[in-house]
């Protein structure tokens, strides 16, 4: 019984000292554009810092639509270093309010989430 208790205590201590990377976005994670003409290509840079104590490695950026493209650093981001993620949205064939979410898969405890909101004015409604 003593050996089982010792093993549990050692495992708990090891987990408590584990290193982790963490996203710390330095600006809002939701960007909103009002009254954008259909056909515009929108872009926004999301600046972040790795506030963890291990290098941050982004493996994937999940999007629900091919109209949204994401460019992220492929190299690990050291602790306390800054970098950015570029999100582009193509408004062609998109109308009225559009909401897009980017889910960032990385070696962090929580997934990063970025949001784009845009009101697209259809070509046939523009003056």
What are these regions (language model features)?
Residues 4-14:
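Sec-dependent N-terminal signal peptides
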Residues 95-124:
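Terminal connector regions
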Residues 19-45, 120-127:
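Beta-sheet-dominated interaction scaffolds and their linkers
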Residues 38-45, 92-101:
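Short, solvent-exposed loop/turn segments enriched in Ser/Thr/Gly
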Residues 85-93:
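Short, hydrophobic beta-strand segments
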Residues 53-84:
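Surface-exposed binding patches on compact interaction domains or structured appendages
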Residues 48-52:
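Asparagine-centered strand-capping/turn motif at beta-strand->loop junctions
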């Amino acid at each position: 019984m003593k050996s089982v208790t010792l093993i549990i205590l050692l495992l708990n201590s090891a987990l408590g000292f584990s290193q982790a990377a963490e996203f710390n976005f330095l600006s809002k994670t939701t960007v909103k554009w009002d009254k954008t003409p259909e056909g515009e290509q929108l872009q926004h840079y999301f600046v972040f810092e790795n506030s963890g104590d291990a290098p941050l490695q982004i493996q994937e950026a999940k999007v629900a639509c091919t109209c949204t493209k994401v460019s992220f650093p492929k190299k690990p981001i050291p602790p306390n270093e800054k970098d950015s993620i570029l999100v582009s949205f193509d408004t062609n064939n998109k109308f009225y309010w559009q909401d897009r979410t980017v889910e960032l898969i990385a070696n962090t405890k929580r997934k990063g989430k970025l949001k784009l909101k845009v009101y697209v004015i259809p070509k046939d409604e523009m003056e």
